[in-house]
Every structure is written in structure tokens, then in C-alpha cells.
Amino acid sequence: MRLFTGIVFCSLVMGVTSESWRSFFKEALQGVGDMGRAYWDIMISNHQNSNRYLYARGNYDAAQRGPGGVWAAKLISRSRVYLQGLIDCYLFGNSSTVLEDSKSNEKAEEWGRSGKDPDRFRPDGLPKKY
């Protein structure tokens, strides 16, 4: 219900017409799929230092969908950062290495959302399928 309310509010604020609203919602759903694929690749790649690249790639792919994709990428990225921060704080306390890693991941996500090439963060040795 909150998601629906948020989408309606965003459409009112942005002055989106009914046709644009449908395309915004479609782009957002496609962006969710792009982000989900990136997070799935993070889980199965099991490659050291691949997180930043895959975060950037997921945000880049979602942003290529349009404004709805950018909105979905921001929402998912911020939710992940918030939840990961809570879990890290609970399990590890306030660690400076956790904070640095979180900041670098956020930088990679913003890089991807801005439409810049995510290959900047690609680690050596990561298989081509990613």
C-alpha cells in the first residue's frame, strides 16, 4: 500500500500524464528486474571485489530504462544501504572499514545511475558473463 501511495504521490509531484504514468511504472518494474539481476549476480559470482562493479552495473541498467528505472534504482539502493547499515551496526558495531566500504559502494551506485560506464569498477578476472 505504501509503495502504491508513493508512486501516486511521485506522479502527482512530477505532473506525469496518464500515459507517462504507465511508462514510468513500466520502467520502474524493469529497473527492479535489473537491480534484482545485479544482486543475484553478486550472490552467485563469488568473486572478490565484484560488488562495486555489479552495483554500478545494476544501477546503470535500471537508469537506461528511463526516469522510472532511476527512481527504482535509488529506492532499492537506499533501502539496501539502510538495512545493511543496521545489520552491520548490530553485528560489528561502528566499524570504519564497514563505513568506507559502504561509501565506496554508494559512489559506484551513483556512477551507474548517472549513465557513466560501470566497467570502471570491473575487477580483474571477473568472468565475461557478468
Curated annotation (Swiss-Prot):
It is found in: Secreted. Residues 1-18 form the signal peptide. InterPro entries: Serum_amyloid_A, Synovial_Prolif_Regulator. Glycans are attached at residue 94. Keywords: Acute phase, Glycoprotein, HDL, Secreted, Signal. Disulfide bonds: none annotated. GO terms for cellular component: extracellular exosome; extracellular region; high-density lipoprotein particle. Induction: Constitutively expressed. Expressed by the liver; secreted in plasma. It holds the Pfam family SAA. GO terms for biological process: acute-phase response. Its main location: secreted. Residues 101-130 are annotated as: Disordered. Apolipoprotein of the HDL complex. Belongs to the SAA family. Major acute phase reactant. This is Serum amyloid A-4 protein. It comes from Homo sapiens.
